């Protein structure tokens, strides 16, 4: 019987492994034409592998695989999807890409592998993606990038790596890669060298470097000079110093060489100086250090992803580009659309999109004072002004905003539904103001917001459901406020990847209903709070231990009790922190519980993001099949056993009847009964033995 079970399981697994199904013909996925393009939508289908499936071979299509369980990609994983022109793999829990996984996808131009758990890009990770122009890998756990990771991507122009754990970029990582748009926000970069890194992206049109712990020392001098020499408006956002302390919070472009390098009186002689104005070339095509087959020998401006025009690539190969010269009279010059810029502000075109309006430090006291109103503003900077309140009416004419900076004002009042018209807003800065309460109504309408910075306010209260209005929020900066507690379910409905709560007044943070909702967290900063190292903090400590040092940014020091003052409670054992609890537990249980994932007494919930007890489906399916087959054979065996028992019972009944007849025959033969017919009227009932035979 066991042999039959094994044979059946093997045959079924073999058959299942060789069946190839068309995801469109068999209606496994939703396949629809949208604006002439076929979209193959396989969202949340539970796929763990794609080698058993195929897609239409007669036309090109966009392949959507987000929300599945493709945790590992093996070589030739997409061999049956060779007509795909874009690939979306967000939210798959993907943690490993084996080199060769993308072989066959030579037509793919856009690859989205964001919101996964990828830790490294190895050499030849992207082998096979010959035509790739756009790579999005933000919100991963990316730490290590091999110098040859992008060497096969000779057409890559847009590289999005924000919100990872990158602390350094290797030399020659961008060699022969024609990068024009680079996003490195929200990583752990302290410096970016010019040689062998920045010098290899001469065609840069847009770069984002915010939210990195920049170390503003001599090593950052080359980055500062490079930023000053790239095209105007190429830098999006700010580069803010994290260290040294004397420069903390200062914008890099506001520093001087003396600030960065006090002991050095001149620029590092190893860096090539930018050419003098008279040495610059006249506008025209120049050779670039990268070429592909069939590509002409000129700069590659190309087309921006959104359909706009990129800045022309007038770059030199071995020297940094010359800074664009902006005259004072051009700042308030009428724009191409003949709309003047509000007085005191400067307006610039964003390549391929709308306007960037800079009203920083212009003594603006109200947004109503900004006249005329420009409807196509996408980035509005109002930092360092005297604004006291903001109201819904202020943003009626700014429906296209993507970035809004209201930092370092005097804002204490935000009218409910103020941002309701800003449906496209992605970045909101309200740091260094006087906000004291956050509520859902204040942020209504911000359905696409990804970044919210409200540090350095006076926030004491966050009402329940505040962040539900921002379902796409990924980065939340709440440090340096007056917070003492967080409401239950405060993070329900959002998938935060980075959270800053340092320098508040938290004595402990509950796990259940608060921290256990941070299932997508990749970086959290909690230092500078007055932690009370007593029994109540044990669940929080165990949660922090499960995160590990890669996610937890800094040490957590006790404020009370006195014997633990300024000690990192992560280095203390649970029985030291809570001796009265562990004194009740046997030594065996105590030693076991030190490494456990939670205490039943404290109601700590395990974090599903770190749950390693899940069974792989490749093990689960054969196991269930074996159980099913075994159960079937067991049922059949029981039926056979029951039928055999019935036959034996019938035989016993037949033998018993024969014995009774023989006994009756014996009695008749002894003439105990009178011969003759049955006489009902007699004193005795008499049977006619002669009328019966054994055959009856």
From Swiss-Prot:
Residues 265-314 are annotated as: Disordered. LRR repeats lie at residues 59-80, 83-104, 106-128, 131-152, 155-176, 178-199, 376-397, 400-421, 424-445, 448-469, 472-493, 495-516. Residues 18-622 are extracellular. The modification Phosphoserine is found at residue 695. Belongs to the SLITRK family. It is involved in synaptogenesis and promotes excitatory synapse differentiation. Enhances neuronal dendrite outgrowth. This is SLIT and NTRK-like protein 1. It comes from Homo sapiens (Human). The gene is SLITRK1.
């Amino acid at each position: 019987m066991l042999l039959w079970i094994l044979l059946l399981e093997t045959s079924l697994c073999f058959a299942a492994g060789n069946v190839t199904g068309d995801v469109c013909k068999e209606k496994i996925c939703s396949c629809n034409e949208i604006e002439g393009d076929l979209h193959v939508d396989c969202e949340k289908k539970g796929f763990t592998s794609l080698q058993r499936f195929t897609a239409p071979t007669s036309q090109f299509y966009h392949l959507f695989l987000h929300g599945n369980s493709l945790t590992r990609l093996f070589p030739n994983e997409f061999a049956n999807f060779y007509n795909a022109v874009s690939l979306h793999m967000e939210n798959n829990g993907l943690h490993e890409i084996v080199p060769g996984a993308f072989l066959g996808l030579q037509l793919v131009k856009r690859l989205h592998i964001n919101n996964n758990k990828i830790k490294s890009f190895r050499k030849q990770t992207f082998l096979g993606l010959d035509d790739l122009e756009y790579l999005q890998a933000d919100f991963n756990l990316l730490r290590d990038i091999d110098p040859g990771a992008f060497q096969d991507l000779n057409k890559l122009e847009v590289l999005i790596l924000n919100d990872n754990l990158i602390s350094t970029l290797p030399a020659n990582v961008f060699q022969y890669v024609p990068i024009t748009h680079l996003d490195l926000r929200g990583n752990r970069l302290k410096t970016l060298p010019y040689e062998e890194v920045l010098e290899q992206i001469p065609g840069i049109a847009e770069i984002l470097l915010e939210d990195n712990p920049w170390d503003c020392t001599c090593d950052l001098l080359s980055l500062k000079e490079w930023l000053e020499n790239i095209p105007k408006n190429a830098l999006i956002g700010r580069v803010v110093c994290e260290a040294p302390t004397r420069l903390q919070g200062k914008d890099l472009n506001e520093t001087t060489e003396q600030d960065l390098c006090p002991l050095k009186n001149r620029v590092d002689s190893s860096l090539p100086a930018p050419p003098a104005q008279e040495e610059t070339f006249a506008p025209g095509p120049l050779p670039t250090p990268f070429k592909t087959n069939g590509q002409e020998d000129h700069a590659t401006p190309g087309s921006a992803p959104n359909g706009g025009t990129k800045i022309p690539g007038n770059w030199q190969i071995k020297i940094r580009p010359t800074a664009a010269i902006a005259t004072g009279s051009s700042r308030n010059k009428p724009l191409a659309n003949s709309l003047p810029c509000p007085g005191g502000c400067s307006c610039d075109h964003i390549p391929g999109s709308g306007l960037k309006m800079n009203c920083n430090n212009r003594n603006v006291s109200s947004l109503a004072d900004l006249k005329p109103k420009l409807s196509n503003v996408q980035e509005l900077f109002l930092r360092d002004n005297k604004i006291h309140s903001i109201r819904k009416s202020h943003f009626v004419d700014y429906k296209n905003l993507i970035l809004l900076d209201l930092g370092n004002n005097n804002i204490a009042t935000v009218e409910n539904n103020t941002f309701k018209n800003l449906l496209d807003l992605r970045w909101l800065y309200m740091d260094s103001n006087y906000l004291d309460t956050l509520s859902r109504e204040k942020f209504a309408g911000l359905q696409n917001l990804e970044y919210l910075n409200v540090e350095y306010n006076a926030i004491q209260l966050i009402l329940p459901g505040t962040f539900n209005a921002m379902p796409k929020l990924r980065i939340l900066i709440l440090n340096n406020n007056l917070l003492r507690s967080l409401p239950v379910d405060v993070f329900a409905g959002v998938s935060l990847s980075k959270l800053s709560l340092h320098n508040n007044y938290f004595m402990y943070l509950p796990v259940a209903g608060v921290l256990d909702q941070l299932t997508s967290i990749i970086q959290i900063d909690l230092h500078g709070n007055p932690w009370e190292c007593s029994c109540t903090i044990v669940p929080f400590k165990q949660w922090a231990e499960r995160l590990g040092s890669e996610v937890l940014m800094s040490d957590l020091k006790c404020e009370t009790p006195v014997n633990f003052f300024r000690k990192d409670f992560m280095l203390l054992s649970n029985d030291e922190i809570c001796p009265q609890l562990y004194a009740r537990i046997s030594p065996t249980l105590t030693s076991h519980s030190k490494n456990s994932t939670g205490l039943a007494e404290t109601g700590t919930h395990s974090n599903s993001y770190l749950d390693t007890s899940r069974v792989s489906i490749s093990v689960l399916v054969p196991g269930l099949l074996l159980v099913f087959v075994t159960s079937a054979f067991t049922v059949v065996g029981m039926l056979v056993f029951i039928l055999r028992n019935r036959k034996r019972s019938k035989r016993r009944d037949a033998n018993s009847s024969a014995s009774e007849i023989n006994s009756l025959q014996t009695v008749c033969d002894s003439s105990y009964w009178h011969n003759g017919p049955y006489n009902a009227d007699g004193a005795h009932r008499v049977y006619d033995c002669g009328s019966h035979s054994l055959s009856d």
